[in-house]
């Protein structure tokens, strides 16, 4: 504790600002710059976008004119071009959390150069998120619903043969009417989506799902069903609710037939749109940097990028800071972004003198670029690479409170929901 008074305790912004001001001559910048507040930054971004769009509307360069018109047609409304400006703002702000924003953009655009079914987007993002995070819950729902409804039918028809596929059980169709066929289609379609490994399979399963599973009005759909109307209505409500939820969850998929779906994802238009978005975002970035340079103003994100550049390009300065700090203690590590983590890594001693404190459950700054997956990856390292200390003991609450919290967290937190596995290690303990 006696060393606390001499510790260099700062926010990441304050630390980087001091580093940059102390080394302005190495970076080749004017040390008298000022930091913009949020409103100033927003106004300068808006002004830069206005100037950029005005120039592109009037350009005589045919290639640039065509690219800009394509983007306006794709993202702007019939009233104004604010939709396209919003895309540029959002993308620009997002990439600032990476050490090299422009390189990150070009690297991601390059993923679309090859066949889409072989791209990182499809293999890692689409298949992983779509199948594991969205469809797992729905698949379990339909299986449970079918089992429950078959159980009811068996009470009425004890000799029902349940060894055949559900759709082939005549007693179920007789008892539940048309709804039974639709429920079986939903269950099979979700299973097909979960096992899909190609765009053809995804398109076909999704096409079947949206085209053939609308139950219709209760009166018409109930026709010929033997079940009591109240019982039938209960299950039809569950059916319609989950079906609408699944359609909402997969709303990012293009509507239409499997053929249209595949045409979309394999089209050159998709690749061209991505290239054009990168092109105009890079143009904006260059103009925005020039505008800030003229006013001699910077954002805290600029300061972090300058600090990163200083450490990555100057070994002597990097070593100076590395020797200065025996330990690097980072609080709220779950809200660190890729740029900040890279700065910490550069001035550490091969990561061996870093101590990170954080809680994935408290990650609330993704909208500002915080990336909790950085903490998650460190947490998953082998034990010989990192030491993990679990701060799970709670000395301020009664066991009744702790047990209630653990019950709620266990129910709502899993690897599939929230990226947090609330197991016995993560659970709160009294003693």
Named regions from a protein language model:
Residues 1-2, 242-253, 378-384, 431:
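Short, conserved catalytic or adaptor-binding loops enriched in Gly and charged residues
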Residues 1-193, 197:
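Conserved ATP-dependent motor core of P-loop NTPases, especially the RecA-like helicase ATPase domain
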Residues 79-86, 90-93, 390-431:
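Helicase-core coupling region on the C-terminal RecA-like lobe
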Residues 23, 48-55, 378, 404-412:
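Conserved AAA+ ATPase "sensor/coupling" helix adjacent to the nucleotide-binding pocket
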Residues 58, 62-86, 100, 174-285:
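Coupling/switch/interface segments within P-loop NTPase motor domains and analogous charged loops
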Residues 385-389:
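Short amphipathic alpha-helical segments
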Residues 8-13, 17, 33-46, 83, ...:
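Conserved helicase NTPase motor core
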Residues 30-35, 58-72, 101-109, 156-172, ...:
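Short coil/turn segments at secondary-structure boundaries
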């Amino acid at each position: 504790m006696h060393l606390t008074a001499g510790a260099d305790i700062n926010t990441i912004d304050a630390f980087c600002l001091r580093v940059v001001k102390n080394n302005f001559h190495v970076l080749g910048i004017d040390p008298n710059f000022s930091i913009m507040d949020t409103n100033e930054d927003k106004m300068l971004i808006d002004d830069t976008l206005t100037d950029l769009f005005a120039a592109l509307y009037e350009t005589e360069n045919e290639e640039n004119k065509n690219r800009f018109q394509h983007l306006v047609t794709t993202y702007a409304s019939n009233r104004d071009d604010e939709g396209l400006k919003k895309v540029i703002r959002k993308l620009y702000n997002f990439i600032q959390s990476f050490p090299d924003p422009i390189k990150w953009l070009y690297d991601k655009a390059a993923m679309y150069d090859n066949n889409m079914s072989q791209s990182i987007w499809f293999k890692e993002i689409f298949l992983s998120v779509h199948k594991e995070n969205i469809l797992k819950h729905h698949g379990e729902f339909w299986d449970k619903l079918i089992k429950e409804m078959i159980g009811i039918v068996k009470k009425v028809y004890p000799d029902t043969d349940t060894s055949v596929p559900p759709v082939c059980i005549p007693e179920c169709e007789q008892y539940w009417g048309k709804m039974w066929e639709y429920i079986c289609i939903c269950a099979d379609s979700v299973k097909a989506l979960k096992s899909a490994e190609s765009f053809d399979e995804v398109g076909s399963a999704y096409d079947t799902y949206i085209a053939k599973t609308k139950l219709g009005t209760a009166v018409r759909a109930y026709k010929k069903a033997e079940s009591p109307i109240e019982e039938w209505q209960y299950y039809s409500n569950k059916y319609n609710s989950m079906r609408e939820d699944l359609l909402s969850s997969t709303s990012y998929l293009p509507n239409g037939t499997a053929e249209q779906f595949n045409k979309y994802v394999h089209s050159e238009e998709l690749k061209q749109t991505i290239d054009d978005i990168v092109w105009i975002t890079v143009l904006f970035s260059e103009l925005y940097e020039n505008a800030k340079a003229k006013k001699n103003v910077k954002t805290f994100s600029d300061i972090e990028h300058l600090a990163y550049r200083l450490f990555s390009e100057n070994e002597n300065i990097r070593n100076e800071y590395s020797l200065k700090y025996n330990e690097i203690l980072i609080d709220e590590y779950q809200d660190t972004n890729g740029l900040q983590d890279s700065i910490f890594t550069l001035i550490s001693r091969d990561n061996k003198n870093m101590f990170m404190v954080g809680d994935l459950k408290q990650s609330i700054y993704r909208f500002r670029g915080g990336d909790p997956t950085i903490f998650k990856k460190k947490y998953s390292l082998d034990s010989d690479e990192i030491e993990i200390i679990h701060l799970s003991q709670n000395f301020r609450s009664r066991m009744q409170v702790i047990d209630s919290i653990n019950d709620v967290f266990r129910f709502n937190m899993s690897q599939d929901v929230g990226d947090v596995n609330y197991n016995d290690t993560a659970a709160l303990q009294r003693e």
